[in-house]
Amino acid sequence: MNIIEIFSKNLKKYRLEKKLSQEKLAELCSFNRTYISSLERGIRTPSLKSIEIISEKLEIDVYLLFIK
């Protein structure tokens, strides 16, 4: 499993744990819902800024998005 696959899996895991839809997380982050969907499917690679924003809105430490 590569780092993008790990990130994608963890993004979805933490989003669901917080009971957020892709739409709601996108709204909180000021992103488009399709961007969140693409990240979760591993189609897009997030920028460092996007990772920072997502972790902030999910209320988790950044490193948790990259742990197997």
Residue ranges and their predicted role:
Residues 1-6:
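A detector for short, charged/polar N-terminal pre-domain segments
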Residues 9-28:
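Short basic helix-loop element that most often maps to the first helix and adjoining turn
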Residues 11, 25-26, 36-39, 65:
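Conserved hydrophobic/aromatic packing and binding residues within compact polymer-binding modules
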Residues 11, 22, 33, 48-51:
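Helix-turn-helix DNA-binding elements, focusing on the entry/boundary residues of the two helices
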Residues 31-45:
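Recognition helix of helix-turn-helix/homeodomain-like DNA-binding domains
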Residues 43-56:
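Short, basic-rich loop-to-helix N-cap that marks the start of a DNA-contacting helix
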Residues 59-68:
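Short C-terminal boundary/hinge segments that cap the last helix of small helical domains
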